[in-house]
Amino acid sequence: MNETTLFDRVGGQAFFDDLVEFFYVAVEQEELIRPMYPEDLTESKKWLALFLAQYYGGPSVYQEERGHPRLRMRHAPFRITKKARDAWLRAMHFALENVA
């Protein structure tokens, strides 16, 4: 049985690239979480798109280029409160609603 991954069903890497573009449009408007990101979002966009693609069954480019995600370690410097969590979720909801 050949299972199709979510990565394949949504159209591959292009979907995740577009999703992340919309996500960061919303992040730019979230005063609480915007300071958690670098001024230039280019690298953040690249890594998030590759991470999400890999997580949902795409190629392991993220891990090959960056190693284990170590999410807890990467986010440790930030105070992620319930309000910050909700701001992140709003940004991702916006992205999901707007991605083609």
Go through each PLM region and give its residues.
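Core of compact, soluble alpha-helical bundle domains
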Residues: 1-100
